[in-house]
Curated annotation (Swiss-Prot):
It is found in: Cytoplasm. Keywords: Acyltransferase, Cytoplasm, Transferase. Belongs to the R-transferase family. Bpt subfamily. It comes from Polaromonas sp. (strain JS666 / ATCC BAA-500). This is Aspartate/glutamate leucyltransferase. It comes from the Bacteria. GO terms for biological process: ubiquitin-dependent protein catabolic process via the N-end rule pathway. SUPFAM superfamilies: Acyl-CoA N-acyltransferases (Nat) (SSF55729). The lineage of its organism: Bacteria, Pseudomonadati, Pseudomonadota, Betaproteobacteria, Burkholderiales. Its main location: cytoplasm. Functions in the N-end rule pathway of protein degradation where it conjugates Leu from its aminoacyl-tRNA to the N-termini of proteins containing an N-terminal aspartate or glutamate. GO terms for molecular function: arginyl-tRNA--protein transferase activity; leucyl-tRNA--protein transferase activity. GO terms for cellular component: cytoplasm.
């Protein structure tokens, strides 16, 4: 394995993608900065990249690199100081009966069908609601870092695992857990997404890891603004992680 001391981040190469339609802000164009070569980005280097605002999508490690827009703000939750609010406590209590099973990344038809139901129910027309098996696999099941798949099932009266309700993909970093992607049964009343974040915070606590990285907070995007509800949290501004109430901050978008 190539260690960071043998492969400092300065030796990695970074390129900017061509502009493409932004997935979160209608009418905006986005660009990404991608770290290469991907086959040399193992867990230690990847952990440092995440602390510098990068994320992972399959084999690609990237961060926003948009022209004239700084709406995507990296956000992380300090595990020791996190305090759940009333709605988060309700979500935690409501789903305590679910059984979580931590697996290596693997393809299961049941997971894929849930993914399609989620995309069609929550993000219809977003471009991912007709993903093929290959697209699903490349997006979520390919990784060279310490990644895990967590499936959540309801508990039957006899204690056995029942219907699949949610799947989370996460990366275990040197200093925390990075929430990669979560999909679930598209019941807007169930608060599955909030429960997934709470579960990952609890896992980080048990592993004695200080942070849970929630990716990018975007104030103008209802899809992403929920992340500001996990408090206290820190945001990455000018290369520094800063305690902040993200809900009061309005990043530059033009």
């Amino acid at each position: 394995m190539t260690h960071l001391k043998d492969l400092p981040l300065q030796t990695l190469q970074f390129y900017a993608t061509a502009p493409y339609p932004c997935s979160y802000l209608p009418g905006k164009q986005a660009r990404s900065q991608v770290a290469t070569p991907s086959h040399l980005i193992h867990n230690d280097a990847y952990s440092e990249l995440v602390t510098n605002g990068f994320r992972r999508s399959g084999m690609f490690t990237y961060r926003p690199y948009c022209d004239g827009c700084q709406a995507c703000v990296p956000l992380r939750v300090p595990v020791k100081s996190f305090k759940a609010d009333r709605s988060q406590r309700r979500a935690w209590s409501r789903h305590q009966g679910m059984q979580a099973r931590v697996l290596k990344l693997c393809f299961m038809p049941e997971h894929y069908q849930l993914y399609l139901r989620y995309q069609n129910g929550r993000h219809a027309g977003g471009g991912m609601d007709h993903d093929s098996i290959d697209q699903y696999t490349q997006f979520l099941l390919q990784s060279r870092v310490n990644s895990r798949l967590v499936e959540f099932r309801e508990s039957l009266p006899n204690g056995e695992a029942g219907a699949l309700k949610m799947v989370s993909i996460l990366d275990v970093l040197e200093d925390g857990i990075s929430a990669v992607y979560t999909f679930y049964e598209p019941d807007t009343r169930a608060s599955y997404g909030n429960y997934s974040v709470l579960w990952q915070i609890e896992q980080a606590r048990r592993l004695e890891l200080p942070y849970v990285y929630l990716g990018y907070w975007i104030a103008q995007s209802p899809k992403m603004n929920y992340k500001a509800g996990f408090k206290p949290h820190e945001i990455l501004v000018n290369g520094q992680w800063t305690p902040s109430d993200a809900a009061t901050r309005r990043p530059k978008t033009d």
